[in-house]
Amino acid sequence: MSVKLEVQRVARTFETTLNAGDVEGANAHFAAEFADRDNELGPLLERAARGELIGTVGNRTLLHLHLTDGETRVVELLWLELHGAWRIHDARVFSLLADE
């Protein structure tokens, strides 16, 4: 199976877990190193009403987060295979431009 399809499959599991309200389960997808230094994605997941996987390129995915306060964010997730499992190794968070 291609890297893109493997990553897309695990990202769908991440999305489903998040949408079930299982933030702890979603955080289990973080690589240990990322979990130690993350100060943005984890808090956003706690505020997420739902997430929507909107794209995959290689080992990167885009997730559209709809937050409980009505705001939204698009998050680029970098997935790396560690010890036989795909984990989130880094994330970049984008705010959508207002009125555009």
Language-model region placement:
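Exposed beta-sheet edge and beta->alpha loop/turn motif
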Residues: L53-E100
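Short solvent-exposed beta->alpha transition segments
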Residues: M1-L62
